[in-house]
Amino acid sequence: MRRRTLLAVALSATAAGALGAVGMTNASAATLDPNLPPGGNFDLSVWSLQLPVGSPGSPETISPARLKGAGGYTNPTFFWTDKNDGSMTFWAPEKGVTTPNSKYARSELREMNANGSAANWTLAGNHTLSAQLRVVSVTKNVAVGQVKLGTGGSSTKPLAELYYRPNGDIYFGTQNSPDASGQTLHKVGNVPLGVKWTYVINVNGNKINFTINGTKTTYTIPSAFNPYRQYFKAGSYNQSSSESTSNGAKVKFYSLTVQHA
């Protein structure tokens, strides 16, 4: 085991404990140091960071080498350690630089390999993203976790996205097919704004298992996705846009782990 931390009509929901058996964390609220940058509290050696600044269509990206460790990167506007609770904090405004295939700004981590190359894993095996977080503010909708399509075809869509809305509703969006633009939204919970909660996204063969606060839901991944490799993303990927730089989505993480087996 190495640590770096869909669509189906039928689904099942079962109770699971806390983060579940695979929900190990590399930091907890009790151990977070508010005086360290995020890389001092979290293992960011296997993540790069996309920011809502840069040139049009090319947001600034911070490498794992710059993020990791007690001397790691911090940004007082978009990516910092909360001085009160030590959380890794992401802010994505409504107006900001976006990637070529999106109209929304983000302050978001992208999974990488330990050697610095982009993570790009097959559906075979057991792949898990676990987090404890809380959404502090959001205008309309924010994606706080993703399973994104990598190589294997022309599509750049996500396989699945986890959304949080201002009323506390949490939705899991599953892509209908690699080439279709539509998602199917599944309501999977409700947590009031500002309250901590946990999620685990586990990809295991042709299944994707999603656990929120201990309740697990399983979806079958359509075979059309089999040629594609995947990678995880986590942070604040705002899902609304305007000319405002003061409105947006602020998300705080208290633990974040990636695990592959």
Give the ranges of each region predicted by the language model.
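C-terminal region of N-terminal signal peptides and the immediate post-cleavage residues
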Residues: 19-31
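Short strand-turn-strand beta-turns centered on an Asx-Gly dipeptide
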Residues: 212-215
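Ligand-recognition surfaces built from glycine- and aromatic
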Residues: 41, 126-128, 222-261
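Short tryptophan-centered beta-strand motifs in secreted/extracellular beta-sheet-rich domains
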Residues: 131, 195-203, 208-210
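N-terminal module-boundary/linker segments of secreted carbohydrate-active enzymes
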Residues: 29-71
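Secretory/extracellular carbohydrate-interaction modules
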Residues: 70-75, 79-85, 89-169
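Short, aromatic/His-centered strand-loop micro-motif at the edge of beta-sheets
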Residues: 174-198
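N-terminal export leaders
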Residues: 3-7
